[in-house]
């Protein structure tokens, strides 16, 4: 771990004083979050450029979470991967089995943890945005940078909340008093997306192109553009999805497509934004890799997906570098090895949140939906070329092209941040794909239940269809 990384993680000032509660732990209920910080405490955290920077660094730490907290690192990837079909669960934990069999109960503690942790992060970013906007003592350029970072984190968090739960309460920087009482009802998905897009557009305006530091652990203008491209794709606004993806893809001085073997190292040119960790060992590696010759990995790539990687005339380099067959007894398990660092002695990987390949695939899908099949093919082929395989056929129809993009997204993004789950939901393909392999699948399973603990704390929260408290 380099010295800059140590400074990033170790020199954060006491955030519990500034933000009115720990950034590193989350409470299960809004009513347990504690009293909001006073105006004096806000000012204490934002009197100087250095102290304000430290508060924002704390938001990144909070977003990363821990190996057992479902913030925006690998635990969220696990739960969505189990709910979809890009992860096979080989364990027996009852709460995880509920995700894997799409039999979630509203009392599932992990579902409640996701909600509570993400809303704790919303609270922290709201407090930061409010304090930053009220501050008169910060250097204007730094103030803009920090507001942009906080709004990016808030938008990213809401993007997960709305795609996991559907309509969710919308708390902003102006709602700090209401937030503590947890009295707001669910807000429409459309309105939440308006806030997401507004935050990201403001962030893109305020953030600079240059990264703060060398390891891309803080967002820049292109990170905001990349997330805007994703959000617009999810909203089926293909004009803007293509526009913002193109902005990122045009930054060839910053971003490149390295070999799959190095895509996830923390100096990779593909990385647009990554969440740092203390020793360069990700919870992805800890969860996906099983140590010991006879240890069965808890989470693996299903055999049916492994068999869809191309092998002729050339073998897909993603299959060779990101999946490792492991035989235990008479059964073969396909271990996900995108992240390979399992020891601090190596310590060269962080949690990659945004990377360039996704932007090619976003633009390909946007172009295909706008009848630009030639442009879509060019973008898919850019991803396939990095994987060492031939381009797709030039004779595909729009429907065939979209199917090819779905497959390419699976091969490229499996096991990462819920991409497969969200893809199947937003394209209305969840039932067609999951019903044949999920015996208990129901169409209402596309949303997680609103946690019963949250409904007890706030009786204005309605339950999603298909669930009971």
Where are these regions (language model features)?
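Hydrophobic-face positions in mid-chain alpha helices that act as interaction patches
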Residues: 96, 242-356, 412, 438, ...
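Long, intrinsically disordered, low-complexity segments
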Residues: 2, 26-27, 195, 284, ...
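Short, surface-exposed recognition loops and adjoining beta-strand edges that mediate ligand/DNA contacts
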Residues: 40-42, 70-91, 208-288, 392-399
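Conserved, well-structured interaction surfaces
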Residues: 53, 61, 93-165, 205-212, ...
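Acidic, glycine-rich segments characteristic of secretory precursors and extracytoplasmic regions
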Residues: 2-6, 12, 23-78, 460-469
